[in-house]
UniProtKB/Swiss-Prot annotation:
Keywords annotated in UniProt: Apoptosis, Cell projection, Disulfide bond, Electron transport, Endoplasmic reticulum, FAD, Flavoprotein, Glycoprotein, Golgi apparatus, Membrane, Oxidoreductase, Phosphoprotein, Redox-active center, Secreted, Signal, Transport
Cofactor(s) required for function per UniProt: FAD
Protein name, per record: ERO1-like protein alpha
Subunit structure: Predominantly monomer. May function both as a monomer and a homodimer. Interacts with PDILT. Interacts with ERP44; the interaction results in retention of ERO1A in the endoplasmic reticulum.
Organism: Homo sapiens (Human)
Tissue expression remark: Widely expressed at low level. Expressed at high level in upper digestive tract. Highly expressed in esophagus. Weakly expressed in stomach and duodenum.
Regulation affecting activity: Enzyme activity is tightly regulated to prevent the accumulation of reactive oxygen species in the endoplasmic reticulum. Reversibly down-regulated by the formation of disulfide bonds between the active site Cys-94 and Cys-131, and between Cys-99 and Cys-104. Glutathione may be required to regulate its activity in the endoplasmic reticulum.
Biological processes annotated in GO: brown fat cell differentiation; cell redox homeostasis; cellular response to hypoxia; chaperone cofactor-dependent protein refolding; collagen fibril organization; endoplasmic reticulum unfolded protein response; intrinsic apoptotic signaling pathway in response to endoplasmic reticulum stress; L-ascorbic acid metabolic process
């Protein structure tokens, strides 16, 4: 009798467990969980967490930054898209309409931007005007003031400086043209396949301090890779010094950011009358879903946040350069220029207040000789990547690739110029540290792209929430 009652109670208990939900299988992960479950908490080599960045960027910074980037000073970027590829000759040009770039007509660009003196402060501009006037009057060099000669020499020296992390375009070249970035937005162009893979393969395989024996996960140009190769790669990566590991993560973060943009501004529908652009959830999942990418997607997104922190830190450190009274965002429209400078300083002070900035003091520490060599290797590798952008077969992709690598290169230049920035005079020309207009425009637009990516991650997270 006791056994019978025991069996009955056990059976009733099992029925109760099933009916109450206990013992049920867990519901399958949502698509949002597969893409974002690992994209949370603290970032490697940092004291900052993803959630703090999301709140700061999406609600305090993003709206004001977008307003600034829509202004004339930041929307016009001069670029040479016709420079030949320095590494190989067989470039396959993308023939799709969406790959094309529409340059500005001469009368579309404000005169203040086109003038040769836009790079410098008001006092420096006056010195250049003196130089230009002397040249127009046919005066000999001796007629220039000693101060002017010194300024011109210093600027020339700086523009050829070994502190630059990018090989910048010669904007005086007849092939360099102004492009309206708002009319040529970064979005999906259809440029993909072996030609696009080749660009990224050269960047990762030859410029990220990686030996050939170490295989990169999910390399589309390699075959037969598995879990062992992935484990070997990350064991190698973790064994690198912090500088080389950071270099790889910056490039991976930039790659991830670009892929977010392409997924967020995808050509969804095309008719004779219009094109419809929007979020392509499938495209995003193929690039970042933890299962579809064998765990790589979430890692790439965390590297995007790392890139965000690096550029955010650079902007916080360069504030004194823009605070100088004679610095202008000069376009020729005095009222607009003053308003834009106020907005710029407001944004930079907001960035300065960010509580968990990346600490770059761990970079290039230790033995001075070794640190100097490592910094030079770091600079040359990144400079080489900026040259690879001239090999991109899609002109729209080339435009944004050149701008974003120059922007990141400018951020690195700022991070490693702390003493020069601290020693700048409060007014007058800054001989030791200055930024050209090209560097300023690329710096803020590049950060604007990363800021947009972080904002778009919130949009994709919401879109994927109910998809399994």
């Amino acid at each position: 009798m006791g056994r019978g009652w025991g069996f009955l109670f056990g059976l009733l208990g099992a029925v109760w467990l099933l009916s109450s939900g206990h013992g049920e299988e867990q519901p399958p992960e949502t698509a949002a969980q597969r893409c974002f479950c690992q994209v949370s908490g603290y970032l490697d080599d940092c004291t900052c967490d993803v959630e703090t960045i999301d709140r700061f960027n999406n609600y305090r910074l993003f709206p004001r930054l977008q307003k600034l980037l829509e202004s004339d000073y930041f929307r016009y970027y001069k670029v040479n898209l016709k420079r030949p590829c320095p590494f190989w000759n067989d470039i396959s040009q993308c023939g799709r309409r969406d790959c094309a770039v529409k340059p500005c007509q001469s009368d579309e660009v404000p005169d203040g931007i086109k003038s040769a003196s836009y790079k410098y402060s008001e006092e420096a501009n006056n010195l250049i005007e003196e130089c230009e006037q002397a040249e127009r009057l046919g005066a000999v060099d001796e007629s220039l003031s000693e101060e002017t000669q010194k300024a011109v020499l210093q600027w020339t020296k700086h523009d050829d400086s070994s502190d630059n992390f990018c090989e910048a375009d010669d904007i005086q070249s007849p092939e360099a043209e102004y492009v309206d970035l708002l009319l040529n937005p970064e979005r999906y162009t259809g440029y993909k396949g072996p030609d696009a893979w080749k660009i990224w393969n050269v960047i990762y395989e030859e410029n990220c301090f990686k030996p050939q024996t170490i295989k990169r996960p999910l390399n589309p140009l390699a075959s037969g890779q598995g879990t062992s190769e992935e484990n070997t790669f990350y064991s190698w990566l973790e064994g690198l010094c912090v500088e080389k590991r950071a270099f790889y993560r910056l490039i991976s973060g930039l790659h991830a950011s670009i892929n977010v943009h392409l997924s967020a501004r995808y050509l969804l529908q095309e008719t004779w009358l219009e094109k419809k652009w929007g979020h392509n959830i499938t495209e995003f999942q193929q690039r970042f879903d933890g299962i579809l990418t064998e765990g790589e997607g979430p890692r790439r997104l965390k590297n995007l946040y790392f890139l965000y922190l690096i550029e955010l830190r650079a902007l916080s450190k360069v504030l004194p350069f823009f605070e100088r009274p004679d610095f202008q965002l000069f376009t020729g429209n005095k009222i607009q220029d003053e308003e834009n400078k106020m907005l710029l300083l407001e944004i930079l002070h907001e960035i300065k207040s960010f509580p968990l900035h990346f600490d770059e003091n761990s970079f290039f520490a230790g033995d001075k000789k070794e640190a100097h060599k490592l910094k030079e290797d770091f600079r040359l590798h990144f400079r080489n990547i900026s040259r690879i952008m001239d090999c991109v077969g899609c002109f729209k992709c080339r435009l944004w690739g050149k701008l974003q690598t120059q922007g990141l290169g400018t951020a690195l230049k700022i991070l490693f110029s702390e003493k020069l920035i601290a020693n700048m005079p409060e007014s007058g020309p800054s001989y030791e540290f200055h930024l050209t207009r090209q560097e300023i425009v690329s710096l803020f637009n590049a950060f604007g792209r990363i800021s947009t990516s972080v904002k778009e991650l919130e949009n994709f997270r919401n879109l994927l929430q109910n998809i399994h």
